[in-house]
Amino acid sequence: MNWKVERGSLADAETITKFQLDMALESEGTILDADTVIEGVRAGLSDPAKGTYYLVLEEGGETVGSLFLTKEWSDWNNCWYWWIQSVFIRAEYRRRGAFTYMFEEVRRYAISEGAASLRLYVDRTNVKAQNCYKKQGMDECHYLMYEESI
């Protein structure tokens, strides 16, 4: 299959929102508020400082997946770490190369921009996603994540 990767725009907000609602339910059993999610997606699409959405499209132009890319500055290493977030590929396109193609495009871009690494976090129970990331050459790192809701 021939894939294409594009940056998301405001015109893609509803598609990305649907992906996020589906991803939260599927991967974590979480039902998100659709109004909150679409506003969050629109905010991300409207403000490049928040990050960049990337879409993977099939040959016919249909959007089959997306991810959100953010950047973290490292004062320790004087470089950027790029974070992949909100990954979703429609079920019927999984294991057909859509994510691999999108990931490789983002990796090429990260290398060309001098990023030190690509990072992401994944739910501990989402073993399928963990295996997918390992197939891309990613390794589990030594950091644990902590959070305090405020």
What are these regions (language model features)?
Residues G44-L55:
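A short helix-loop-beta-strand connector motif used in the catalytic cores of GNAT acetyltransferases and
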Residues Y53-G65:
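Conserved beta-hairpin
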Residues E62-K71, F88:
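Conserved beta-strand in the GNAT
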Residues I89, R95-R108, N131, K135:
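Conserved acetyl-CoA-binding loop-helix of GNAT-fold acetyltransferases
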Residues T100, R124-L144, E148:
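Conserved active-site alpha-helix within GNAT-family acetyltransferase domains
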Residues A110-Y121:
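Conserved GNAT acetyl-CoA-binding A-motif
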